[in-house]
UniProtKB/Swiss-Prot annotation:
Protein name: Glutamyl-tRNA(Gln) amidotransferase subunit A
A Pfam cross-reference name: Amidase
Organism: Pseudomonas fluorescens (strain Pf0-1)
GO biological-process terms attached to the record: translation
EC number, as in UniProt: 6.3.5.7
Subunit and interaction comment: Heterotrimer of A, B and C subunits.
General function of this protein: Allows the formation of correctly charged Gln-tRNA(Gln) through the transamidation of misacylated Glu-tRNA(Gln) in organisms which lack glutaminyl-tRNA synthetase. The reaction takes place in the presence of glutamine and ATP through an activated gamma-phospho-Glu-tRNA(Gln).
Key words of the record: ATP-binding, Ligase, Nucleotide-binding, Protein biosynthesis
Length: 483
C-alpha cells in the first residue's frame, strides 16, 4: 500500500479497495518503524490523522469524491497548523503552537487530505542540506551518509522513502527543486503569487513560494490543484484562474520549443550530470520537442544578488522573534536589551544568525545602495533575460543542481560552497517564474534532476512536459533500497 501514488490512492479509495483509515494506519506504522533512520519528521500527528481519515471515509460514503479526499500527506514545518507545534526547524519556535491554520493547510484539509505530521527542514528554511535544523539533520534514503537537499529535506526524504505519497514544501532559492533532484522526486515551485503565503512562516517574502513534492508529475498536479488559488489574506497572492492541472496532462510535445541556456553547461557542472541532461533532451526530442540554444547572460550575477536580497528580507522578517510575544525567551533577563539579545542568541542557530547579520549589513545606511539596491537591479536584469528567452522558446531546460547530494557535514565549514549549489535554481525565484525538477538518472547511485522553467502561470505546461517524459522513462519509479 505504501508504494501507491496519490493518483493510485484516489482510484483505490473511489473503487473501495481500501479505506483512508486503513491506509493512514499503514503509513503511520511505517513512519514509526522507518523514520528513526531518516529523521524526516519533527512532529507526528497520529490522532489528527486518524480523525481526518475517518471523516474522509464518511464523506466518501455520503457520495463525495475528489482526488485528495482521504489522501495522506505531511506539511513542511513552516506552515502554521492550529494547535500543533510549528517550529520552522528552530529552537526559537520549539514551543510555538500556531493559533490558526495556514491557507495551504486549510485548503488541503477542506479537500479532504489527512495530515500525518510536520516535516523536518533547515532552520527558518535557510539551507540546502537540511543540516541546520535544531532537530538534527535529515538523511537521504538513497544513501544515509548523504544529505537529502534543503530546505524541504524532511518532506523529500519522507516521500522518497515511501513513508507517504506526497508532501507540501516551500522554495525560496531551490528548496523544493533541489531536494526533489537529490531524492529522485518531482517537485514544483509555482509562479510567485500562485499559492498563498498566509500562515507560511516567512524567510524572504519576495522569493518564498509553497508547492508540492511527490513522486510523479501527475501527483504534483493533484496536490498543486488543492494548494493553488487566490487568497485575500495574502497581498502578494494573484487572482488568476486555476486550470485543471490533471486534465491538462495529455498534451502532445510535437513542436514544443525547448531552450537550453549555454551558461548552464560551464565550469562547476559535474560532467556526468551534463550527460544525463543530454539524455533527457534526446528523450524529449523523440517526443517531438525542438531544441534551441539560448543565452541567459546575467545568470552569473544571480547568486550574489540572491544572497543580498534573501538575507536582507530575512533580517527584517525575523526581527519579530524577540522573546516577547511568542517563541523562545531567555531565563531571567536583566533588562529589555538583555532579553532581546539572549533570546535571539539562544533561539537562532548559526546559519540563521549569519544570514540575519549579512542582511542587516546590506540594508545599513552606508551600504544600502552598494548592495541591496544593486542586487535589485540585477534581479530586474535576470527577469528581463527570461522574458527575452520566452519570446523564442516555450520551456527552458537544464540541470537542477551542479552536483549530486554531498556527504553529511561536507560543506558545513564553507557556507559559500553550499550557496553555489543553488546556481541553477535561484534565478526562477528572483524572476518569480514556475520551475519543476524531475528525475533524470543516477550518478554513483545518487539521483539527479533535470529542471524545467516556464513563463508565468504555465505550471500546467511544466507538468504536462514532465508527465509525457515520465510516461516514456522509468527513473521516477526507482525506489531506494531498504525502503
Amino acid at each position: 500500500m505504501h508504494q501507491l501514488t496519490l493518483a493510485e490512492i484516489a482510484r483505490g479509495l473511489a473503487d473501495k479497495k481500501f479505506s483512508s483509515e486503513e491506509l493512514t494506519k499503514v503509513l503511520l506504522a511505517r513512519i514509526t518503524q522507518l523514520d528513526p533512520q531518516l529523521n524526516s519528521f519533527i512532529s507526528l500527528t497520529e490522532e489528527l490523522a486518524l480523525e481526518q481519515a475517518k471523516a474522509a471515509d464518511v464523506r466518501r460514503a455520503n457520495g463525495e469524491s475528489g482526488a485528495l479526499l482521504g489522501a495522506p500527506i505531511a506539511h513542511k514545518d513552516l506552515f502554521c497548523t492550529q494547535g500543533i507545534r510549528t517550529s520552522c526547524g528552530s529552537k526559537m519556535l520549539d514551543n510555538f503552537k500556531a493559533p490558526y491554520d495556514a491557507t495551504v493547510v486549510s485548503k488541503l484539509a477542506a479537500a479532504g487530505t489527512v495530515t500525518l505530521g510536520k516535516t523536518n527542514m533547515d532552520e527558518f528554511a535557510m539551507g540546502s542540506a537540511n543540516e541546520s535544523s535544531w532537530y538534527g539533520a535529515v538523511k537521504n534514503p538513497w544513501n544515509l551518509e548523504h544529505v537529502p537537499g534543503g530546505s524541504s529535506g524532511g518532506s523529500a526524504a519522507a516521500v522518497a522513502a515511501r513513508l507517504l505519497p506526497a508532501a507540501t514544501a516551500t522554495d525560496t532559492g531551490g528548496s523544493i527543486r533541489q531536494p526533489a533532484a537529490f531524492t529522485n522526486l518531482t517537485g514544483l515551485k509555482p509562479t510567485y503569487g500562485r499559492v498563498s503565503r498566509w500562515g507560511m512562516i516567512a524567510y524572504a517574502s519576495s522569493l518564498d513560494q509553497g508547492g508540492p513534492l511527490a513522486r510523479t508529475a501527475e501527483d504534483c498536479a493533484i496536490l498543486l490543484q488543492g494548494m493553488a488559488g487566490f487568497d485575500p489574506n495574502d497581498s502578494t497572492s494573484i487572482d488568476e484562474p486555476v486550470p485543471d492541472y490533471a486534465a491538462g496532462l495529455n498534451g502532445s510535445l510535437q513542436g514544443l520549443r525547448i531552450g537550453v541556456p549555454k551558461e548552464y553547461f560551464g565550469a562547476g557542472l559535474d560532467p556526468r550530470i551534463a550527460d544525463l541532461i543530454q539524455n533527457s533532451i534526446k528523450e524529449l526530442q523523440k517526443l517531438g520537442a525542438v531544441i534551441k540554444e539560448i543565452s541567459l547572460p546575467n545568470m552569473q550575477h544571480a547568486i550574489p544578488a540572491y544572497y543580498v536580497i534573501a538575507p536582507a528580507e530575512a533580517s527584517s522578517n525575523l526581527s519579530r522573534f524577540d522573546g516577547v510575544r511568542f517563541g523562545h525567551r531567555c531565563a531571567d533577563p536583566k533588562n529589555l536589551e538583555d532579553l532581546y539579545k539572549r533570546s535571539r542568541g539562544e533561539g537562532f542557530g548559526p546559519e540563521v544568525q549569519r544570514r540575519i547579520m549579512v542582511g542587516a549589513y546590506a540594508l545599513s545606511a552606508g551600504y544600502y545602495d552598494a548592495y541591496y539596491l544593486k542586487a535589485q537591479k540585477i534581479r530586474r536584469l535576470v527577469k528581463n533575460d527570461f522574458m527575452a528567452a520566452f519570446n523564442e522558446v516555450d520551456i527552458i531546460l537544464g540541470p537542477t543542481t551542479p552536483n549530486p547530494a554531498w556527504k553529511l557535514g561536507a560543506k558545513n565549514s564553507d557556507p559559500v560552497a553550499a550557496y553555489l549549489e543553488d546556481v541553477y535554481t535561484i534565478t526562477a525565484n528572483l524572476a518569480g517564474l514556475p520551475g519543476l525538477s524531475m528525475p533524470a538518472g543516477f550518478v554513483d547511485g545518487l539521483p539527479v534532476g533535470v529542471q524545467l522553467l516556464a513563463p508565468y502561470f504555465q505550471e500546467g505546461r511544466l507538468l504536462n512536459v514532465a508527465h509525457q517524459y515520465q510516461l516514456n522513462t522509468d527513473w521516477h519509479t526507482r525506489t531506494p533500497t531498504g525502503f
